[in-house]
Amino acid sequence: MRGEVKMKIGAITVGQSPRTDVTADIMGIFNGKAEILERGGLDGLTREQIQEFTPKEGDYVLVSRLNDGTSVTFAERHIIPRLQQAIQELEEQGTAFIMMFCTGKFPDTLKAKVPLIYPCEILDRVVPLLTAASSILVVTPSPLQITQSEEKWSRIVAQVSVTACSPYGEWKELEEAASLVKDTKADLVVLDCIGFSQEMKQLFAKETGKPVILPRTLLARLVSELTDV
């Protein structure tokens, strides 16, 4: 009996690969029918080298995870060429399509020969469908991202409240953040970073009593439609 051939799916993190924290929550969704091949925008770089990417005023800010489990904050513009290289490498490995392990917005200059699936594009379309009052609470990793998050979501929904709490910090900080926002008026909570886990989703759902959108599983469930054959 022939072994089942798994579909090759690329995954690009803006930080360092592999993102074992993300795949821990999503591999079960693919039900053994997919092989995930990963690359990262900061792969091969030391923390000292990454510090040269520190955001300046006007930069689009990203937060991601390094191999040692710590997080870094950096300007997107520094890694665009590295992301393009990652796309090319994954295409050469025969991936059917590529998932971006980041909810940030990326420039149209990134090109791929296979479908390149951005969580932000999914969120932009799905979130308005799930809030009757067009009112959401967004959790973003860094205070440096609050303004860009407010600007982005205010174009999509009528009312948005944004708070900052890193998925890469201490669990106590997440508990405090969830407690602080539990009375915020909103229909829906959006954990706007691929770093937020299923356990973190459950924490915010319990504290706020509201439905919570988790990008990593939303992305995987959409992509699994293409592997479920």
Residue ranges and their predicted role:
Residues 44, 132-133, 168-170, 212-229:
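Short, flexible loop segments at boundaries between secondary-structure elements
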Residues 2-73, 140-170:
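N-terminal glycine-rich anion-binding loop in soluble enzyme alpha/beta folds
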Residues 90, 180-183, 204:
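Generic structural signal for hydrophobic
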Residues 9-12, 98, 136, 189:
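Buried hydrophobic positions in well-ordered alpha/beta secondary-structure cores of metabolic enzymes
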Residues 85, 170-185:
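A short, acidic, amphipathic alpha-helical segment used as a generic capping/interface helix at domain edges
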Residues 99-106, 111-147, 151-155, 159-176, ...:
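Conserved mixed alpha/beta catalytic, RNA-binding, or beta-rich assembly cores of soluble enzyme
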Residues 174, 187-208, 215, 219-223:
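Hydrophobic alpha-helical
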